[in-house]
Amino acid sequence: MHAYTLKAPAKINLLLEIIGDRPDGFHELVMVMQSVNLADIVELQPLSGDRIELFCNHPQVPCDQSNLAHRAARLMQEQFPGKGGVAITIDKKIPIGAGLAGGSADAAAVLVGLDLMWGLGLTQAELHTYAAKLGSDIPFCVSGGTALALGRGEELTPLPDLDQLYAVLAKYRSLSVATPWAYKTYRQQFSESYARDPEALEKRRREGHSVELLAAISHRDSQKVPQYLYNDLEKVVLPEHPQVQEIRDLFQSFGALGTMMSGSGPTVFGLADSRSKAELMATQLQTALPDPDLEILVTKFCSSGIQLLS
């Protein structure tokens, strides 16, 4: 068996609309997800027996069974017994606790890598099925690009690529927002707006905030797409964390094509149509907020998910 090295891109949400509750306790969502070039590098090496060993260069990333990458390897061993063990090495580039799906991307890389290493020949639909057992973002991280995501996020429809856009990502390293808290607080404050039956849910899917954004994406209109960014979770996170609102306001004042908090945060992104404009915006933000705790990264939209490097 060969070793494999894979690129695992981060993702941002261009749209996150909460439209109702699900029987499983999760929310019914309408999302548009987007891969970016910022990525972890995940290396897989075969091991004898059924050992799973995990290594990461970031001290705050757990290397035990709580890590999604470890759980992905265990799931694959359970589904395909006797294929052997694996050593997983993660070179962490995606900020942790940032709402950028770094852990989900690593798990997706393990699924794709073990499919290759073990010669399973799984289809993308089969990979998505296993990914959905692990987490809502992981099916998207497998295939990446630009996609409409429904349900918990596992029902994916590919959309035209938007890889001409750049994003400046900004996050205070010491700030984290617990995703369960964000959704629970939203439910407490806004559940009266939820769709209550299948017909109402379908109507919200067809006629909600995604309509204009999906139309702009269908035309690959890089000027209009940023005008239709939308995230329901901003309603609960921004009042609680004014420093996130401040970054958003600054991106607007610097002339970003669009700006929004990604997912449950706390990362905020500002969009530009060229690298030079994105880098200027990053410099302006650094000057306005010269705080060493603030991490600022310039990246580009990309059109694929997990990529084989070697």
Swiss-Prot record:
Q: What is its EC number?
A: 2.7.1.148
Binding positions (ATP): 95-105
The pathway entry for this protein reads as: Isoprenoid biosynthesis; isopentenyl diphosphate biosynthesis via DXP pathway; isopentenyl diphosphate from 1-deoxy-D-xylulose 5-phosphate: step 3/6
Name a Pfam family for this protein: GHMP_kinases_C
Regarding protein family, the annotation reads: Belongs to the GHMP kinase family. IspE subfamily.
- List, alphabetically, the PANTHER family matched: 4-DIPHOSPHOCYTIDYL-2-C-METHYL-D-ERYTHRITOL KINASE, CHLOROPLASTIC (PTHR43527:SF2)
Which reactions appear under catalytic activity for this entry?
4-CDP-2-C-methyl-D-erythritol + ATP = 4-CDP-2-C-methyl-D-erythritol 2-phosphate + ADP + H(+)
A GO BP term, please? isopentenyl diphosphate biosynthetic process, methylerythritol 4-phosphate pathway
> Known HAMAP family for this protein?
IspE (MF_00061)
- Mention one GO molecular function: 4-(cytidine 5'-diphospho)-2-C-methyl-D-erythritol kinase activity
Q: What does this protein do?
A: Catalyzes the phosphorylation of the position 2 hydroxy group of 4-diphosphocytidyl-2C-methyl-D-erythritol.
Q: Which residues form a coiled coil?
A: none
The record's active-site residues are 11, 137
- Respond yes or no to whether keyword Nucleotide-binding is given for this record: yes
Enzyme class, broadest EC rank: transferase
Write down what this protein is called: 4-diphosphocytidyl-2-C-methyl-D-erythritol kinase
Q: Which UniProt keywords apply?
A: ATP-binding, Isoprene biosynthesis, Kinase, Nucleotide-binding, Transferase
